[in-house]
């Protein structure tokens, strides 16, 4: 809904991580929600899109310049085999991040691609990324007791995202 508050937003680089049935209490339909996110793709000079998300892929036709990322082994920008790749070059091992979940590795990759689109070198921020503990209440491990890992994700708005990003039994 925050995009609605910025009708004249025209970023040089924008990104859409996913479009899932969330925040539907604010919209008449999922199509209306997707249209609100689509505006970002259209208004961005360069748009970084999640190539794993069918709804994001549908936006590509409307966007000007698209950079894709995802998890498919055929994607040049991907999270796969325990690492982040940009243009098929391994740049970071996922295990070097302090963040839980595949979604966080994908978020990091998206941010690195946005930096690159702005003309900055992703390698310059890798040391900081390795130290970043994440935000409070966002997929944070709080304890591990008798082989059970306890994760605080109390800021999450979509349980489906947690189910997808934490393949271990919950």
Predicted regions and their residues:
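Structural motif
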Residues: 13-14, 46-47, 67, 140, ...
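Beta-strand->loop->alpha-helix junctions that form or flank phosphate-binding loops
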Residues: 50-51, 64-81, 126-130, 140-143
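Fold-independent oxyanion-binding glycine-rich loops
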Residues: 18-19, 50-52, 69-72, 88, ...
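Short polybasic amphipathic segments
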Residues: 82-88
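Flexible active-site lid/hinge loop adjacent to a nucleotide/diphosphate
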Residues: 1-62, 68-69, 80, 92-99
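Nucleotide phosphate-binding/pyrophosphate-handling subdomain across enzymes
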Residues: 94-170
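Residue-level detection of beta-strand-connecting loop/turn positions
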Residues: 88-89, 147
């Amino acid at each position: 809904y925050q995009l609605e508050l910025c009708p004249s937003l025209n970023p040089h680089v924008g990104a859409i991580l996913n479009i899932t049935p969330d925040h539907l209490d604010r919209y008449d339909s999922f199509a209306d929600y997707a249209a609100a996110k689509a505006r970002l793709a259209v208004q961005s000079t360069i748009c970084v899109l999640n190539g794993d998300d069918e709804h994001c892929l549908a936006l590509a036709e409307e966007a000007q310049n698209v950079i894709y990322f995802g998890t498919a082994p055929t994607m040049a920008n991907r999270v796969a085999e325990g690492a982040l790749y940009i243009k098929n070059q391994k740049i970071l091992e996922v295990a070097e991040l302090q963040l839980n979940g595949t979604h966080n590795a994908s978020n990091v990759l998206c941010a690195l691609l946005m930096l690159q689109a702005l003309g900055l070198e992703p390698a310059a921020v890798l040391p900081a990324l390795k130290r970043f503990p994440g935000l409070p209440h966002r997929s944070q491990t709080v304890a591990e007791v008798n082989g059970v890992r306890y994760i605080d994700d109390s800021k999450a708005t979509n349980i489906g995202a947690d189910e997808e990003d934490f393949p271990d039994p919950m």
